Curated annotation (Swiss-Prot):
HAMAP family: UreG. Disulfide bonds: none annotated. Homodimer. UreD, UreF and UreG form a complex that acts as a GTP-hydrolysis-dependent molecular chaperone, activating the urease apoprotein by helping to assemble the nickel containing metallocenter of UreC. The UreE protein probably delivers the nickel. The keyword Repeat does not apply. Pfam families: cobW (PF02492). Facilitates the functional incorporation of the urease nickel metallocenter. This process requires GTP hydrolysis, probably effectuated by UreG. It is found in: Cytoplasm. This is Urease accessory protein UreG. It comes from the Bacteria. GTP binds at residues 16-23. InterPro entries: CobW/HypB/UreG_nucleotide-bd, P-loop_NTPase, UreG. Keywords: Chaperone, Cytoplasm, GTP-binding, Nickel insertion, Nucleotide-binding. Its main location: cytoplasm.
Length: 211
C-alpha cells in the first residue's frame, strides 16, 4: 500500500494472469461505484486497446473516462520498471477531470511475478481464478503474497475443474499471512461488495470526498 491519504485520486492497480477476470472486475467496480465516486479507468494491452473497448461496450463509464495504453512490450514493464506511460495517462485523466476520486489501472495479463510500482498504485489488487487449479495460491509470487488484496475469481467453476475452495483458502492464508483475500464470482457479482468495501476503507475514499 502506498499513500491513500494523498489529496490526489486514489490509484488502484489491478493485476493478474490473462483471463483471470481483471476487466470484469473493472466493469463491476465502475457500475457499482460510479454513482458515488468520480472515476476513470486506464487499461494496459500490449498491441491493442481491447480491454478498454470491452469496458466501453459494457457502458462501464463514458468513453472520455476510459483510456487504453498500448505498452508495446512485456506488460509488467509498464507497471513496474518503467511506469512512465501509465503515470502520463493518470496525469492526463487528472487534468481532464480535476475532481477524480478514483482511478483504476488494469495491467496487461501477466504472470505471478508481476507487481505495481509504488509510484503508480496506492492499492494493489491481484486477481487469480479457480480455473487455473487449486494449486495457484500456494505457487506464491509477489502478486499472491504482497498484493494488498487477493481475489480468487470464478468460484462457480470449482466443481468442473476439481478445485477445492477450502484448500485454496488455506493456502492463500498461509502464503499471505494477515493480508486479506476474497472469493468472487464476477459473472454473478458475488463478492464484489466486499472488494468495494475494502477499497473504500483502505483507500480512505470517503475521507477524500470530505476534504
Amino acid at each position: 500500500m502506498s499513500n491513500p491519504s494523498s489529496p490526489n485520486p486514489l490509484r488502484v492497480g489491478i493485476g493478474g494472469p490473462v483471463g483471470s477476470g481483471k476487466t470484469a472486475l473493472c466493469e463491476m467496480l465502475c457500475k457499482r461505484m460510479r454513482d458515488n465516486y468520480d472515476m476513470a479507468v486506464i487499461t494496459n494491452d500490449i498491441y491493442t486497446k481491447e480491454d478498454m473497448e470491452i469496458l466501453l461496450r459494457a457502458d462501464a463509464l463514458p468513453a472520455e473516462r476510459l483510456m487504453g495504453v498500448e505498452t508495446g512490450g512485456c506488460p509488467h514493464t509498464a507497471i513496474r520498471e518503467d511506469a512512465s506511460i501509465n503515470l502520463e495517462a493518470i496525469a492526463r485523466m487528472s487534468a481532464d477531470f480535476p475532481d477524480l476520486d478514483l482511478i483504476l489501472v488494469e495491467s496487461g495479463g501477466d504472470n505471478l511475478a508481476a507487481t505495481f510500482s509504488p509510484e503508480l498504485s496506492d492499492l494493489t489488487i491481484y486477481v487469480i481464478d479457480v480455473a487455473g487449479g487449486e494449486k495457484i495460491p500456494r505457487k506464491g509470487g509477489p502478486g499472491i503474497t504482497r498484493s494488498d488484496l487477493l481475489i480468487i475469481n470464478k468460484t462457480d467453476l470449482a466443481p468442473y475443474v476439481g478445485a477445492n475452495l477450502d484448500i485454496m483458502a488455506q493456502d492463500a492464508k498461509r502464503m499471505r499471512g494477515e493480508r486479506p483475500f476474497v472469493f468472487t464470482n464476477l459473472r454473478s457479482g458475488d463478492g464484489v461488495e466486499t472488494v468495494i468495501e475494502y477499497i473504500r476503507k483502505q483507500g480512505l475514499l470517503d475521507e477524500k470526498r470530505k476534504n
